């Protein structure tokens, strides 16, 4: 036997085993993929028509609530913007009423604070300094 013939046989056996490994790997991956598809579809298939209808109703109700909320926000935003424009537009009556209104609020705030009795903290006793003129002695 030639040593070259042995190497050729080894190469052929390695090549075929590599091909077989690749084939087996591809088959295994395909089976795993098919199992994943079955698992994903099995949940939907196991659910009854009533359950599917219930979930669809929940989804529709949620979408309708979102739409209602959005329309409510849009409508109130328009009203708010109108009120804001009115408040920002200076008028003679507004200026007079706002100044008297502010004065009334200050008066009310002062009267409320006077009515409340809270904790009274006494400060440290203050020392009074008495200065006497220094007399110089006649010496």
UniProtKB/Swiss-Prot annotation:
The keyword Zinc does not apply. Residues 83-139 are annotated as: Disordered. The keyword Repressor does not apply. Residues 113-139 have a biased composition (Basic residues). It is found in: Nucleus; Chromosome, Telomere. Residues 90-101 have a biased composition (Polar residues). Keywords: Chromosome, Nucleus, Telomere. It comes from the Eukaryota. One of its GO terms (cellular component) is chromosome, telomeric region. Involved in telomere length regulation and promotes fully efficient non-homologous end-joining (NHEJ) by a mechanism activated in postdiauxic/stationary phase. Belongs to the FYV6 family. This is Protein FYV6. The gene is FYV6.
């Amino acid at each position: 036997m030639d040593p070259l013939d042995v190497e050729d046989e080894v190469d052929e056996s390695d090549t075929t085993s590599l091909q077989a490994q690749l084939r087996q790997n591809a088959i295994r991956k395909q089976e795993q993929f098919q199992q994943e598809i079955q698992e994903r579809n099995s949940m939907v298939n196991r659910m009854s028509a009533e359950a599917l209808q219930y979930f669809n109703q929940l989804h529709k109700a949620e979408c309708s609530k979102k739409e209602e909320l959005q329309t409510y926000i849009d409508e109130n935003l328009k009203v708010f913007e109108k009120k804001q424009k009115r408040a920002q537009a200076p008028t003679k009556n507004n200026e007079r009423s706002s100044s008297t209104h502010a004065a009334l609020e200050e008066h009310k705030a002062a009267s409320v604070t006077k009515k409340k009795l809270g904790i009274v903290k006494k400060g440290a006793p203050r020392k009074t300094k008495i200065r006497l003129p220094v007399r110089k002695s006649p010496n």
